Amino acid sequence: MTAKATLLVLALVVMATSGVSSASVAGGPVVNSDTVSRSDPERLSTRGCVANCQANQTGIDCIKYCGIGIGRRDITQQ
């Protein structure tokens, strides 16, 4: 992966995780269970995240709420 592509992916991940605490961005996406459980309990489950990824085609919901691999793969393919 070129440096430009790496920066683009990092920028997308930062944008996708902007609603999450800044500490989680440095170490990768981390679930803030308090926020997620109040907004949408289904997103706490892997099945819910996969369904959101498939529905949105971007995987941003997966990264923001669960940080699972399918979301990262979808973003790098854009």
UniProtKB/Swiss-Prot annotation:
The keyword Disulfide bond applies. Residues 1-22 form the signal peptide. The keyword Zinc-finger does not apply. Keywords: Amidation, Disulfide bond, Neurotoxin, Secreted, Signal, Toxin. Residues 23-47, 74-78 form a propeptide. GO terms for cellular component: extracellular region. This is Conotoxin Cl14.9.
